Design a protein with these regions (language model features):
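Extracytoplasmic gate region of multi-pass secondary transporters
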Residues: 30-39, 225-288, 371, 375
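Intracellular juxtamembrane helix-capping segments at the cytosolic ends
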Residues: 41, 120-134, 335-348
């Protein structure tokens, strides 16, 4: 972890700590923990299963897609630091206001605001931030950062369930919002730096001949216009949209589904926690091994397993089947977002990574927020999740196949 010849710890590892905390709160706590609130929204505010997820889908359609594309360009122009800080402010504000909502339209409006914050503070800016600071050790650095996502996810269900029982869902939202703002604002202001060049450094802390290698490697970065005309770009976009859509469908409905299967809120939260503990194990494995194996093949295998494991939900009334699903699906989630940025960087370089990731993430966000809404509509119409889970399983496996067809080295060589 030491860089250059000075023996000092390379500052990029402090960037990894900042990214870890960002993933912990913005994705781990908010994305994976927020579905715990859905039961309260359904029981106390009268929302349907589709309505509790359609707010985020509307947010994606209204602001996520257009502002996501803008976020990528802004990151490349002004740096990830200020984009992340803006997003943190928006997410925190939306949660504080959500604690006062009483109507569906208020919920939907605040979901739009939260999605905008997620776009700025979430995967796009954080992945670009880490990718700019590392090259040779990019996979390991990204893996450590993504442990924040898994760690937040592990903590979130049980913690939020406790806060709701102890203080009510309104105060629980306020507590989560304040914690997010108190931690991420100081870290963003005093720790985060958008690029190593701001501190007179190079990726990985490289010096001398190693620095020359870094410079030469980045000259191979593909222009955005060239990249979007390649088969690889569309395979990554299509595959990640399907697989991450499957993840979103399960995560957003898992607790509601388990309640429908006869489990209590506390037991459902334990299953959700178990799933996310398994995802943490998957992230540790991927983070350790990703620089040693084919990134796109690893991504394909994990995505295929995501889809295949959903079949177990058909027998979820049996606790053993529910735990088996949580273990396999959770472990397979270890490659969900992280490998998207690594495979994209491997195919196209990093000079325009912000713009390319914005395009890809906005694409898979259609699945991430759209699939849960579709699953909710199916449940509201049929009063059963069976058809929804069958479609989700097919989507995940098809996503894995698409990623397997990516030919990273050949495509990059042709574009360079």
């Amino acid at each position: 972890m030491r860089g250059g010849e000075s023996g000092k710890i390379f500052y990029g590892w402090w960037i990894v700590v900042a990214a870890f905390l960002n993933f912990f709160f913005v994705i781990g706590i908010i994305f994976y923990g927020f579905p715990v609130f859905y039961t309260s929204f359904v029981e106390e505010l009268g929302f349907t299963h589709a309505q509790v997820t359609q707010g985020f889908f509307l947010g994606f359609l209204i602001v996520g897609l257009p502002f996501g594309l803008v976020a990528g360009a802004v990151i490349d122009r002004v740096g990830a630091k200020w984009v992340i800080l803006t997003g943190v402010a928006l997410v925190g504000t939306s949660l504080l206001l959500m604690a006062r909502m009483t109507k569906l339209w208020q919920y939907e409006a605040l979901c739009v605001l939260e999605v905008l914050g997620y776009v700025f503070a979430g995967p796009i800016a954080t992945q670009v931030l880490v990718a700019r600071w590392f090259r040779a050790r990019r996979g390991r650095a990204m893996g450590i950062a993504y442990l924040g996502l898994g760690s937040g996810g592990v903590v979130a269900p049980m913690l939020i369930n406790y806060l709701i029982r102890a203080h009510g869902w309104e105060h629980a939202l306020e507590i989560v919002a304040i914690a997010l703002l108190v931690v991420l604002f100081p870290v963003g202001i005093w720790v985060t730096r958008s690029t190593p060049e701001e501190m007179g450094l190079l990726p990985d802390g490289a010096t001398g001949s190693a620095a020359t290698g870094v410079a030469i490697a980045d000259t191979a970065s593909s222009r955005v216009a060239e990249a979007v005309r390649t088969k690889n770009f569309w395979l990554i976009l299509f595959g990640s949209t399907l697989a991450i859509g499957a993840i979103g469908a399960v995560i957003q409905h898992f607790i509601l589904f388990l309640k429908d299967q006869g489990y209590s809120s506390a037991v459902a939260a334990r299953f959700s926690t178990g799933l996310l503990v398994a995802s943490l194990a998957g992230r540790i494995l991927v983070g350790y091994a990703v620089d040693l194996v084919s990134k796109k093949n690893a991504m394909a295998v994990f995505y295929f397993l995501i889809g295949a494991s959903v079949v177990l939900l058909m027998a979820a009334r049996v606790p053993t089947a529910a735990w088996a699903f949580a273990a396999i699906f959770g472990f397979s989630m270890g490659a969900d977002y992280m490998l998207v940025s690594l495979v994209t960087a491997e195919c196209f370089g990093t000079s325009s990574l912000g713009k390319l990731l914005a395009l890809i993430i906005m694409g898979y966000s259609l699945g991430q927020w759209g699939f849960p809404w579709v699953v909710g509509k199916i449940f509201d119409a049929r009063h059963s999740y069976d058809l929804a889970w069958k479609l989700t399983a097919v989507a995940g496996m098809a996503g894995g196949l698409a990623i397997y067809l990516v030919s990273a080295r050949k495509e990059k060589a042709r574009l360079s």
